[in-house]
């Protein structure tokens, strides 16, 4: 019962937020899965590669500080990462934990596809510092 109420209330909030939305193609750059939740709740297409992943605050800040180089750098697979999901490594050793993917090739394909839609002139950045893999 409580779960059903939560779903109904969340959808009511989502409808209200969608009705106020004027920017239909924001590039949300988040250090965890929050951006994906926001895109889903607002019914928007993903305009960012930062979906279904987690980055430590240190790695996220390094990526932001070196944005133009990082976003165009090659992402290589980290073999034997110790995690049960793929991990990639970009510029300056920045690690990307693709926590909702099974295979690195799939996560890399989505990363590249969404990088093509990224709009640096229409970007919002959010760092979450709630601990390891919060909200993922």
Name the predicted role of every residue range.
Residues 2-136:
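Extracellular glycan-modifying ectodomains
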């Amino acid at each position: 019962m409580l779960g059903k109420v939560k779903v109904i209330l969340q959808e009511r909030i989502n409808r209200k937020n969608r009705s106020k939305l004027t920017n239909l193609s924001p590039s949300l750059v988040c250090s965890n899965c929050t951006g994906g939740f926001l895109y889903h709740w607002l019914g928007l297409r993903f305009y960012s590669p930062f979906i279904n992943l987690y980055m430590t605050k240190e790695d996220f800040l390094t990526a932001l500080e070196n944005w133009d180089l990082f976003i165009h750098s090659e992402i290589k697979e980290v073999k034997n990462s110790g995690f049960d999901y793929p991990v990639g490594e970009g510029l300056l050793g920045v690690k990307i934990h693709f926590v909702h993917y099974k295979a690195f090739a799939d996560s890399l394909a989505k990363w590249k596809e969404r990088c093509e839609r990224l709009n640096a002139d229409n970007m919002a950045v959010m760092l979450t510092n709630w601990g390891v893999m919060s909200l993922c």
